[in-house]
């Protein structure tokens, strides 16, 4: 199941249930809220507004953890990360709430589902 620019809703959970792989956008809420606050304080109201508005249509890592808990998913793979993590500390902000086995995708990553197998391979 592939989802993009959406919150985790009951319908997303329903559609994800039983999926081998769920690819979902993800937002590190604490980073976005921090950037929003700093933008507002520095007078950059346009950026602050954008950072506020994107919270309405990106799934938080806590909500994605709930998705993984409530739906039977083989692999939760996150893409379209907001904000795009540029270092290990930012990646850690995404990993904090995620269940074991969740994957933060990278450009060029391949997820393979071999025929006649339950195996999910990430390369």
Regions found by a protein language model. Name each.
Residues 1-17, 110-123:
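Core dinuclear metal-dependent hydrolase active-site scaffold
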Residues 7-108:
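Cap/insert and terminal regions of metallo-dependent hydrolase folds
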